Amino acid sequence: MKYLNCFISTGLAAFFLVNSTSVLAADCSSDLTSGISTKRIYYVAPNGNSSNNGSSFNAPMSFSAAMAAVNPGELILLKPGTYTIPYTQGKGNTITFNKSGKDGAPIYVAAANCGRAVFDFSFPDSQWVQASYGFYVTGDYWYFKGVEVTRAGYQGAYVIGSHNTFENTAFHHNRNTGLEINNGGSYNTVINSDAYRNYDPKKNGSMADGFGPKQKQGPGNRFVGCRAWENSDDGFDLFDSPQKVVIENSWAFRNGINYWNDSAFAGNGNGFKLGGNQAVGNHRITRSVAFGNVSKGFDQNNNAGGVTVINNTSYKNGINYGFGSNVQSGQKHYFRNNVSLSASVTVSNADAKSNSWDTGPAASASDFVSLDTSLATVSRDNDGTLPETSLFRLSANSKLINAGTKESNISYSGSAPDLGAFERN
């Protein structure tokens, strides 16, 4: 027996005690290191049977049987494939995660061999049921990896629990927001995950975002290495949330376009909607990219609090940065080292410098190796990280190199940070 590292990402790691022939690691993990071990593995397959004991993929359990049996510190190991949840017109078909793991002993739900386990809730395109979430996560300390949720009747995942992690997951073609955190959900982390083509027929596309940590969500929610594209409303929506959300190294693009031929389409089309409804939310976004969004790339949206915006790139949105609304007395935005190209900027009530539209050098197409935005949907690397392409990378002679201001928690090479989301090494 030995430990095989299965979850390596952005400093977060979990380790499973499995047989020396790994069903988890395959070719996309590294560093065989001791750490947290599972007490038990429940092997699950799309054709699993509740009468099986789940001791191997030769005798796989059903997912529902594994959910009933699993305890903190244990692993539900999913054979890659499609897990179909039957649809009945007018009825919900939610999977509820109401158990809780513990600090240091979460409940793991992971696809084997770095594969994908797709939970298909089977809702037809125009059908929806109020609160028919795909995954309803009410418990705490769950860790999901390699899982996709599609065609749910409402949100793909609705999270009100805390200390949950979603790594290398995807939420697409659902009837509302891909993954929403609300009603007290706190200290949840979403890593290297995608949300795309989510649309709500209920309100003609005006609700379905990619990721939505919003309204009554609690403190400590964080998004790292995530992509949100071609959702009917916004990519990331932090509407009406006074609790700080942190977004790092994430991309939002082509949101708010009517891909559904809805004659009454009402999607907003912001990349990163960073607040709203006059709530005071001191959110932070760094090293992120927005392009091709119908409305704004980075949007204040009536947030009455100051937002921190450092080392981001915005290109060809309706407006690249829209921060023209009033803020509460004593509040101020903080802008450093950001790039705007091929669209306008409105920033007021801000401490702003070393951006391409103020004291920093103006950006032009020649500053970049590539502006081919089709590269944004290149497949992720095997470990789930965003693909390293030439898109928005600085050219060797770019005037944006070393043109930024040093900031805490912003790494750089050279004499000073570069402008924009990507540091040239």
Swiss-Prot record:
Catalytic activity, as annotated: Eliminative cleavage of (1->4)-alpha-D-galacturonan to give oligosaccharides with 4-deoxy-alpha-D-galact-4-enuronosyl groups at their non-reducing ends
Signal peptide per UniProt: 1-25
Annotated protein name in UniProt: Pectate lyase L
Native species: Dickeya dadantii (strain 3937)
Positions of Ca(2+) 2 binding: N402, S413, A416, D418, E423
PANTHER family: PECTATE LYASE (EUROFUNG), PECTATE LYASE PEL9
Biological function: Presents an endo-cleaving activity on polygalacturonate or partially methylated pectin. Is effective in the maceration of plant tissue, and has an important role in soft-rot disease. Is 280-fold less active against polygalacturonate than the major pectate lyase PelB. When assayed on polygalacturonate, PelL releases oligogalacturonates of different sizes; upon prolonged incubation, PelL degrades the primary products to unsaturated tetramer and pentamer in addition to unsaturated dimer and trimer.
Residue numbers binding Ca(2+) 1: D209, D233, D234, D237
Essential cofactor(s): Ca(2+)
Main location: secreted
Cell location: Secreted
Family: Belongs to the polysaccharide lyase 9 family.
Record GO terms (molecular function): metal ion binding; pectate lyase activity
